[in-house]
Amino acid sequence: MADILKIGKYEFTSRLIVGSGKYPDFKTTYDATIASGAQMITVAVRRVNITDPNKENLMDYFKDSDVQLLPNSAGCTTAEEAITLFRMVREATGIDIIKLEIIGDTEKTLYPDVIETIKACEVLANDGFTVMAYTNDDPITAKKLENAGAAAVMPLAAPIGSGLGIQNRYNVVFVKEAVNVPVIVDAGVGCASDAAIAMELGADGVLTNTAIAQAKNPIQMAEAMKYAVIAGRMSYLAGRIPKKPYATASSPSEGMIQF
């Protein structure tokens, strides 16, 4: 039976989401996305063209694929800005699944402004959007976002683009326990093992951009991320053994040859 990721009315068989930033061109973005097997790609609509048909348009590369464009509000610092932006995007493209991202610290950490995020989430969800909300790794905030109508919560693993990996593994577990919507670990993934760990902790998916786009070989890293997410998910579903302080022999003691 297929292991489906369901976000609102949308369903996906891949649990990896990729970003579109920091690539040299749209062609490389497309090639890496296809290699990753991802079925969603985030697009910062204030920076990447998806609405003007008279300019090079990222949508042209994906129009014949099954990859869903996921507009995000990167660059927005208030709920009002994000709400206005997404309404314009839906009017221009018809896309209603979005990544809500409202930054509180634009200089150093790029941490989210969770108060503005919750405000925007409630308005956008009531307006018919399927909202995937970028947030900190706090289970209380995650629950508030779910109550505000978020179809998925996206706690950061570490600061955006840092490549530090998951800095607080317990919080990923706490967020997962706190909500009944998918949890997508977002930001800070640096390599394939980070993605696998996120999935083994119980995350429903992983979003990564910089780790692929700025790798020495983006296509190869995209493929590595694909298999890391699959392996991590399978490991989580299989169930890990408990940790013990002492050794346990793997071979039975019965029937041993006596000397």
Swiss-Prot record:
Family statement drawn from the similarity comment of this UniProt entry: Belongs to the ThiG family.
Family annotation (InterPro entries): Aldolase_TIM, Thiazole_synthase_ThiG, ThiG
Pathway(s) it belongs to: Cofactor biosynthesis; thiamine diphosphate biosynthesis
Annotated PANTHER family: THIAZOLE SYNTHASE (PTHR34266:SF2)
Alphabetic keyword roster: Cytoplasm, Schiff base, Thiamine biosynthesis, Transferase
HAMAP family cross-referenced by the UniProt entry: ThiG (MF_00443)
Binding site for 1-deoxy-D-xylulose 5-phosphate: G161, A187, G188, N209, T210
Subunit text: Homotetramer. Forms heterodimers with either ThiH or ThiS.
Gene Ontology BP terms: thiamine diphosphate biosynthetic process
Enzyme class, UniProt record, top EC level: transferase
EC annotation from Swiss-Prot or TrEMBL: 2.8.1.10
Function: Catalyzes the rearrangement of 1-deoxy-D-xylulose 5-phosphate (DXP) to produce the thiazole phosphate moiety of thiamine. Sulfur is provided by the thiocarboxylate moiety of the carrier protein ThiS. In vitro, sulfur can be provided by H(2)S.
Subcellular location(s) per record: Cytoplasm
Superkingdom as given in the UniProt entry: Bacteria
Swiss-Prot/TrEMBL catalytic activity: [ThiS sulfur-carrier protein]-C-terminal-Gly-aminoethanethioate + 2-iminoacetate + 1-deoxy-D-xylulose 5-phosphate = [ThiS sulfur-carrier protein]-C-terminal Gly-Gly + 2-[(2R,5Z)-2-carboxy-4-methylthiazol-5(2H)-ylidene]ethyl phosphate + 2 H2O + H(+)
Protein name listed in UniProt: Thiazole synthase
Listed GO MF terms: thiazole synthase activity
